[in-house]
């Protein structure tokens, strides 16, 4: 049995993201005093009274708005309601009961899911009376809280976990492969993830930047279990004017940090940009597994040499990571979609690969025989022993006479030898050098 899912729903700006972040213990959703700022579902793991569960923060519901984004947010909330075991219906105790609350309540009653009515922004004891009018919603006794001050959260969670079945409380931590999809706005990240998930999971529209935060989705396939992280598209700084866009840039870097595999998506009709190089360069610098996907390949006029030519140009622009894997797809038509997670899994397998110490030392000894280390100053590097000390990425320690003797060109040679012999395609690897006195 998987972990129970708790969805936090309500009209815009009632404090859902603030509550979500308090419960998650970290800043996950973009929070700003602008209605509609949380535009997509965001997941986080939480625990209360030994019950582990997954929370979903939804975009605010505005049932009568015709705005394209708000209508899609409403659809997202409906999907969250369909998925949830328990729903926290958050309302604003300062503003009081609003017509939109009535309509949200109707949606929730139709869901026939357990609902905990929570009145937020009750910052003082005297404000408790503000909660009484919410009895009119017909959803039961309201719980009063102040999410910004973390007041009343324990009482609220007590009510939530009452609805969990006993056999749902022991969900185990997922051993999932985390994949971050990164790239410029409107390159097709959300469209690809939706294809992989088989549901309209993310806000997809022709408006650049419709994914403003980093969103997690889960999918199980024959190749493994994956967490798919869709990030806000990164723009040049001159174009990033809104405060909210700055948050999203930070979130993209944070998503790369927690990813196992980073997929850089490039628009085949536009090619690679400096911004693409910068963001994937960060993933390279911290030694992530990397897959470069060229999307919208269906829009390119081509012959039998077009793909090779395109790949060569990419490799020139991404020469700092010659190990990256490449895939040409069309998220719109489904071309080569089945290979996306398969190839990502191959990258992950190399990212977590271990090499036996004996075999490793045989390869390095052979490499030294083929190419002796250069003399640096008056010393020649001597390599006594090498061992792998970790994965994610594969990390190797070379015990040598003097780490100062390692020339960058010889270090690159050793890395290439490891790659050629053990197939680390698609992942960064780390080489460290430590001094050891000769016996």
From Swiss-Prot:
It comes from the Bacteria. GO terms for biological process: ribosome biogenesis. InterPro entries: AAA+_ATPase (IPR003593), G_ENGA (IPR031166), GTP-bd (IPR006073), GTPase_Der (IPR016484), KH_dom-like (IPR032859), KH_dom-like_a/b (IPR015946), P-loop_NTPase (IPR027417), Small_GTP-bd (IPR005225). SMART domains: AAA. GO terms for molecular function: ATP hydrolysis activity; GTP binding; ribosome binding. CDD domains: EngA1, EngA2. This is GTPase Der. It comes from Clostridium botulinum (strain Langeland / NCTC 10281 / Type F). The gene is der.
């Amino acid at each position: 049995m998987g972990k129970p899912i708790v969805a936090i729903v309500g009209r815009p700006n009632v404090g859902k993201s603030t509550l979500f972040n308090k419960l998650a213990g970290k800043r996950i959703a973009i929070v700003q005093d602008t209605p509609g700022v949380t535009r997509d579902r965001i997941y986080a793991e939480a625990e209360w009274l030994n019950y582990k569960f997954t929370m979903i923060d939804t975009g605010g519901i505005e049932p009568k708005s015709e705005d394209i984004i708000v209508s899609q947010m409403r659809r997202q909330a409906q999907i969250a309601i369909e998925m949830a075991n328990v729903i926290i219906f958050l309302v604003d105790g300062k503003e009081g009961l609003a017509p939109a609350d009535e309509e949200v309540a109707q949606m929730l009653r139709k869901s026939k899911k357990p609902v905990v009515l929570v009145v937020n922004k009750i910052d003082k004891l005297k404000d408790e009376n503000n909660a009484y009018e919410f009895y009119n919603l017909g959803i039961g006794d309201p719980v009063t809280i102040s999410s910004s001050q973390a007041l009343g959260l324990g009482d609220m969670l007590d009510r939530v976990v009452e609805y969990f079945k006993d056999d749902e409380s022991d969900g185990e931590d997922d051993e999932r492969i985390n994949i971050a999809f990164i790239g410029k706005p409107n390159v097709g990240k959300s469209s690809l993830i939706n294809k992989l998930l088989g549901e309209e999971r993310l806000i997809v529209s022709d408006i650049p930047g419709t994914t403003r935060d980093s969103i997690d989705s889960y999918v199980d396939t024959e190749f493994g279990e994956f967490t798919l992280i869709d990030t806000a598209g990164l723009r040049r700084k001159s174009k990033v004017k809104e405060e909210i866009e700055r948050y999203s840039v930070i979130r993209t870097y944070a998503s790369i940090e927690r990813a196992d595999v980073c997929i850089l998506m490039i628009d085949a009709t536009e090619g690679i940009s400096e911004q693409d190089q910068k963001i994937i360069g960060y993933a390279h610098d911290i030694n992530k597994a990397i897959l470069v996907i060229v999307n919208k390949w269906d829009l390119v006029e081509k012959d039998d040499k077009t793909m090779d030519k395109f790949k060569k140009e990419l490799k020139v622009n991404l020469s700092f990571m010659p190990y990256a894997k490449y895939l040409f797809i069309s998220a719109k038509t489904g071309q080569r979609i089945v290979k996306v997670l398969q190839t990502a899994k191959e990258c992950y397998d190399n990212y977590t690969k271990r090499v036996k110490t004996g075999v490793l030392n045989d390869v390095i000894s052979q490499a030294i025989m083929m190419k002796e280390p250069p003399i640096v100053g008056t010393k020649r590097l001597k390599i006594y022993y090498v061992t792998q000390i970790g994965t994610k990425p594969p990390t190797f320690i070379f015990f040598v006479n003097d780490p100062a003797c390692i020339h960058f060109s010889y270090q690159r040679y050793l890395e290439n030898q490891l790659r050629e012999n053990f197939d680390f395609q698609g992942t960064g690897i780390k080489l460290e050098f430590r001094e050891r006195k000769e016996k």
